[in-house]
């Protein structure tokens, strides 16, 4: 086994979930020097609740973050603990079926809580703040990244985990002779809010609505709209996201000068869901001040790597949230790279082959998740060209639709990567002492 005595210098740009998770794992290895650069003055995640499928939970555990996750994660109470979502007709909350995720169910967390739990384990000196990347140069096997504050960092490998508006993505694509890819508006907006679960129970009692709808994750489906709920913060808060889509234009646009997130009124939200049933309306009436999110994603990229710069997470494959899979794909990226880079057989001499394996093995799966996330939104909103509003077909489709996504064996991909690299086994790196 070859040990790189000089070590690998690795920079990570972006302090979201995937960037922090990767930094936490890499800093454990004595042959790696890692620095994490975050543009904001402190760690923090925009958004509210986020759910993770079984594949994402396996990646979290594989990255050594299972304990931190369980401290803040929620799961549906017994006997519904394996339910991912129950599916209901938006007009009257009639039951259409359920999707079961054995052993995991609806595993969810408040984004900020998860980041807070992770960063408490990050060693001092790893993270630097106020570091917005502005330029990247590569020369002689070394990467130089420049920041808007005038500082720079040099490393053997630069990892772009800087989200859908990534500054590093243009460097990667231009290096491949391709035009930059900018986020595209999906035509769907989402009203978001957090509801006190006791308040929601009272509202449902007043309307004669079954309180079971509070206890179990729900998805209400309707034409050009859907509403989801799931508990966070030990069931005390219900995360609510109400999606509404305008399909009048084949290529919708969002005004360049308009924010992606803005405050909205309850009246605006209720008007968008006029004609929906009592359960949906009573739920939305519990949100006095929703925020409106314009949902963007990326086109599938032809490559995630240029030289010694690599993209992960939303920087590489930002997707619509309809499979609850975006954060999970970033964590799969982090797990895949951590397992390879953390091996002492990894060194500056085989980084190119290692990154090629990452691109070849991770990109097709991530692209498929991107595409099916869009298709799933069409299904939820009764616009699937085959299923349409056929409730029997809808229930049958949703019962098994996510199996391929959740049951994927990432370790099989890693075994193939090691075989390509000529590594006979998955030898781990030497752990840093102290």
UniProtKB/Swiss-Prot annotation:
Coiled-coil stretches: none
Record's keyword terms, sorted: Aromatic hydrocarbons catabolism, FAD, Flavoprotein, Monooxygenase, NAD, Oxidoreductase, Plasmid
Top-level taxonomic group: Bacteria
GO molecular function: FAD binding; salicylate 1-monooxygenase activity
Documented EC number(s): 1.14.13.1
Aminoacyl-tRNA synthetase among keywords: no
Reactions the enzyme catalyzes: salicylate + NADH + O2 + 2 H(+) = catechol + CO2 + NAD(+) + H2O
One of the GO BP terms on file: secondary metabolite biosynthetic process
Required cofactor names: FAD
Gene3D superfamilies: FAD/NAD(P)-binding domain
Pfam families, per the entry: FAD_binding_3
Class of enzymatic activity (EC top level): oxidoreductase
Residues annotated to bind FAD: 9-38
Assembly description: Monomer.
Name of this chain's protein: Salicylate hydroxylase
């Amino acid at each position: 086994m070859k040990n790189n005595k000089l070590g690998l210098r690795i920079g990570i740009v972006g302090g979201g979930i995937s960037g922090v998770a990767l930094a936490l794992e890499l800093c454990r290895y004595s042959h790696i020097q890692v620095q994490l650069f975050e543009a904001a003055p402190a760690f923090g995640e925009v958004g509210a609740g986020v759910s993770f499928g079984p594949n994402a939970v396996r990646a979290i555990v594989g990255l050594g973050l299972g304990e931190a996750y369980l401290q803040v994660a929620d799961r549906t109470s017994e006997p519904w603990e394996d339910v991912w979502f129950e599916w209901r007709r938006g007009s009257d909350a009639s039951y259409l079926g359920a999707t079961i995720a054995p052993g995991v169910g609806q595993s969810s967390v408040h984004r900020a809580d998860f980041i807070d739990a992770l960063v408490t384990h990050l060693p001092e000196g790893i993270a630097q703040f106020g570091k917005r990347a502005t330029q990247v140069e590569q020369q002689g096997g070394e990467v130089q990244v420049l920041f808007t504050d005038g500082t720079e960092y040099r490393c053997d490998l630069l990892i772009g985990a800087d989200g859908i508006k990534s500054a590093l993505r243009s460097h990667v694509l231009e290096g491949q002779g391709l035009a930059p890819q900018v986020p595209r508006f999906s035509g769907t907006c989402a009203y978001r809010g957090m509801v006190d679960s006791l308040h929601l129970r009272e509202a449902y009692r007043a309307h004669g609505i079954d309180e079971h709808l509070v206890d179990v994750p729900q998805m209400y489906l309707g034409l050009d709209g859907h509403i989801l709920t799931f508990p966070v913060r030990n069931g005390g808060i219900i995360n609510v996201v109400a999606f509404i889509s305008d399909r009048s234009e084949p290529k919708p646009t969002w005004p360049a000068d308009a924010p992606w997130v803005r405050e909205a009124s309850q009246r605006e939200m209720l008007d968008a869901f006029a004609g929906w049933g009592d359960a949906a309306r009573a739920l939305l009436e519990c949100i006095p001040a929703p925020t409106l999110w314009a949902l963007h994603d990326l086109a599938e990229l032809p490559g995630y790597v240029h030289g010694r710069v690599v993209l992960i997470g939303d920087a590489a494959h930002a997707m619509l949230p309809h499979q609850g899979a975006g954060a999970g794909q970033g964590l799969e990226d982090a797990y895949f790279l951590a397992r390879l880079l953390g091996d002492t057989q990894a060194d500056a001499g085989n980084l190119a082959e290692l990154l090629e394996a990452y691109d070849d093995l991770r990109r097709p799966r991530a692209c498929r998740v991107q595409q099916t996330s869009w298709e799933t939104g069409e299904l939820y909103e009764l616009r699937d060209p085959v299923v349409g509003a056929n409730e029997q077909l809808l229930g049958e489709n949703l019962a098994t639709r996510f199996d391929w996504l959740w049951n994927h064996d990432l370790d099989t991909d890693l075994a193939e990567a090691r075989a390509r690299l000529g590594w006979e086994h998955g030898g781990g790196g030497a752990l840093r002492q102290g």
